[in-house]
From Swiss-Prot:
Biological processes per GO annotation: translation
Membership in a protein family: Belongs to the bacterial ribosomal protein bS16 family.
Domain of life: Bacteria
Protein name: Small ribosomal subunit protein bS16
DNA repair recorded as keyword: no
MF (Gene Ontology): structural constituent of ribosome
Key words of the record: Ribonucleoprotein, Ribosomal protein
GO CC terms of this entry: cytoplasm; small ribosomal subunit
Pfam families (UniProt xref): Ribosomal_S16
Record-linked InterPro entries: Ribosomal_bS16 (IPR000307), Ribosomal_bS16_CS (IPR020592), Ribosomal_bS16_dom_sf (IPR023803)
UniProt key word Ribosomal protein: yes
PANTHER family in the record: 30S RIBOSOMAL PROTEIN S16, SMALL RIBOSOMAL SUBUNIT PROTEIN BS16M
Length: 90
C-alpha cells in the first residue's frame, strides 16, 4: 500500500480549508484516509498551519511520501529538516 501525506479539501465553496491527512495513494482526494495530522487555512493572513510534529515524523519514517504542497508546508514548519537529521544521523 503506497501511503501519501496530502491535503483534503474542506470548507464551503470559494472558502477552502484543508486537513493534512495520511491516505492510501489510490483513494480519492476527499475520500478515505488513515489519519489526520494537521490543518492548513490559506485564507487567514498569514496562512495558518498546524501540524502534529510527532505524527508527521512517525509517518515520514514509515515511508509516507508527502505531496508537493505538503512538502512545502512541512519544510516551513521545520519538520522535514528534523526528519532529514533523524534519517541521516546528524
Amino acid at each position: 500500500m503506497a501511503v501519501k501525506i496530502r491535503l483534503k479539501r474542506m470548507g464551503a465553496k470559494k472558502s477552502p480549508f484543508y486537513r493534512i491527512v495520511v491516505a492510501d495513494s489510490r483513494s480519492p482526494r476527499d475520500g478515505r484516509f488513515i489519519e489526520t495530522i494537521g490543518t492548513y487555512n490559506p485564507l487567514t493572513e498569514p496562512a495558518e498551519i498546524k501540524i502534529n510534529e510527532e505524527l508527521a515524523l512517525k509517518w515520514l519514517q514509515n515511508g509516507a511520501k508527502p505531496s508537493d504542497t505538503v512538502r512545502n508546508l512541512l519544510s516551513k514548519q521545520g519538520i522535514l529538516e528534523k526528519f532529514h537529521n533523524l534519517k541521516y544521523g546528524k
